C-alpha cells in the first residue's frame, strides 16, 4: 500500500535568529533532523515524500537536502514531490499589508494535488523518533482514518525555557476528545509546571504528527473557506488556519474521530538557540548506542 510522508518545511528560515535552524547539521556526517525523519519514515514503510516549502527557498532547500534525499529515495523506490505554500493561494482577497503565512492548515492544503494516499504530516524541524512513524503507518495501512502520535510530555520539554504544548484529553478508547494548548511549561525538580500550576509530566501531548487520509483534505479545504469568511475579517494580519485547532473544532462538533497512538520516544526540537548543542549531543548518543548508523541510510 502506498503511503506519504508530508513534511511542513515552508517556515524554514523564519524562527531562529542566526542561521536557518531546520538546515543545521546535527551529526558529524552533516545530516539534519529532516534526514532522520525521512529515514525513520522509510524504515516504517512510507514510500512517497512530499516537501511543502516556499518558492523563494527552493534553490537552497534542494542544495542542502532536497537533491540528496531525492537520490536516496530513488534507491529505495520512494518517490519525491514538492508543493509550494503561497500566501496568495487563498479563497478570497489578500488583506492589504498581510505578510504572515496562513498556518499549517494552508500548508497541508498546498499539497492536495500530490497526495493520493493516506499520509503522515510532520514539522520539518522536529525529531520524532522511530516509534511514532511505525505506529501511524500501521494504523493507516490497516484502514484507520485519522490518528495522532501522542508524546509523553516529559519527553518533549526544553532545559532552556518554557514551551507551549497541546495536552491531549482522551476517552476510554484512546480517542482524542480535546487538545488543550498550555503555554510556558517549564521543567521543575518534581516534574513540570505552567505559570505556577503543576502539570502532569506523563500527559500525552500533540507534536503535530498526524496520520490522515486524502478525504480529510476536502474537509480541510472547506474549513479554509469558512475560516476566510469568519476569522480573517476580524484579524486580517494575524489570523492563522492551524491543523490542531481545526481538528479540535471537528472533534467538538462530532465530525471526526482521532485515535491517539502513544509513543515513548523522546522528541527533540530547537525551540531555543541553546537547544542546538543538547540536540546534537542526543544524536551523538543515539549513534553511539546503535539506534542509527553513521552512514544513516545504509540500514534501510
Per-region residue spans from a language model:
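Conserved core of the sugar-phosphate nucleotidyltransferase
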Residues: 130-210, 214
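A C-terminal functional module that forms or caps the active site or interfaces directly
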Residues: 221-256
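Conserved N-terminal catalytic core of the sugar/cofactor nucleotidyltransferase
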Residues: 1-7, 31-121, 128
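Hydrophobic packing residues within well-ordered alpha-helices of enzyme cores
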Residues: 61-65, 136, 220, 279
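Glycine-rich N-terminal loop/short-helix segment of MobA-like nucleotidyltransferase
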Residues: 1-28, 44
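A short, conserved beta-strand element in the Rossmann-like catalytic core
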Residues: 13, 127-129
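Catalytic beta-strand/loop signature of glycosyltransferases that borders the donor
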Residues: 204, 258-265
Amino acid at each position: 500500500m502506498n503511503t506519504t510522508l508530508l513534511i511542513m518545511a515552508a517556515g524554514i528560515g523564519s524562527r531562529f535568529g542566526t542561521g536557518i535552524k531546520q538546515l543545521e547539521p546535527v551529526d558529524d556526517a552533516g545530516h539534519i533532523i529532516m534526514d532522520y525523519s525521512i529515514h525513520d519514515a522509510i524504515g516504517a514503510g512510507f514510500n512517497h515524500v512530499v516537501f511543502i516549502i516556499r518558492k523563494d527557498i527552493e534553490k537552497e532547500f534542494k542544495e542542502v537536502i532536497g537533491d540528496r534525499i531525492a537520490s536516496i529515495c530513488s534507491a529505495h523506490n520512494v518517490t519525491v514531490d514538492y508543493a509550494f505554500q503561497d500566501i496568495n493561494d487563498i479563497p478570497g482577497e489578500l488583506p492589504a499589508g498581510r505578510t504572515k503565512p496562513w498556518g499549517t492548515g494552508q500548508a497541508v492544503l498546498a499539497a492536495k494535488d500530490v497526495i493520493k494516499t493516506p499520509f503522515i504530516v510532520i514539522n520539518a524541524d522536529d525529531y520524532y523518533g522511530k516509534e511514532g512513524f511505525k505506529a501511524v503507518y500501521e494504523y493507516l495501512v490497516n484502514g484507520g482514518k485519522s490518528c495522532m502520535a501522542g508524546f509523553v510530555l516529559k519527553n518533549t520539554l526544553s532545559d532552556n525555557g518554557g514551551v507551549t504544548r497541546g495536552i491531549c484529553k482522551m476517552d476510554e478508547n484512546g480517542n482524542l476528545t480535546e487538545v488543550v494548548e498550555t503555554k510556558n511549561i517549564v521543567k521543575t525538580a518534581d516534574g513540570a509546571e505552567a505559570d505556577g500550576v503543576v502539570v502532569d509530566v506523563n500527559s500525552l501531548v500533540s507534536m503535530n504528527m498526524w496520520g490522515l487520509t486524502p478525504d480529510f483534505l476536502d474537509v480541510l479545504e472547506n474549513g479554509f473557506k469558512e475560516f476566510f469568511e469568519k476569522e480573517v475579517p476580524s484579524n486580517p494580519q494575524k489570523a492563522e488556519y492551524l491543523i490542531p485547532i481545526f481538528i479540535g473544532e471537528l472533534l467538538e462538533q462530532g465530525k471526526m474521530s482521532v485515535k491517539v497512538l502513544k509513543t515513548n520516544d523522546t522528541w527533540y526540537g530547537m525551540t531555543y538557540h541553546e537547544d542546538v548543542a543538547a540536540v546534537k549531543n542526543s544524536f551523538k548518543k543515539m549513534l553511539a548506542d546503535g539506534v542509527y548508523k553513521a552512514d544513516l541510510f545504509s540500514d534501510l
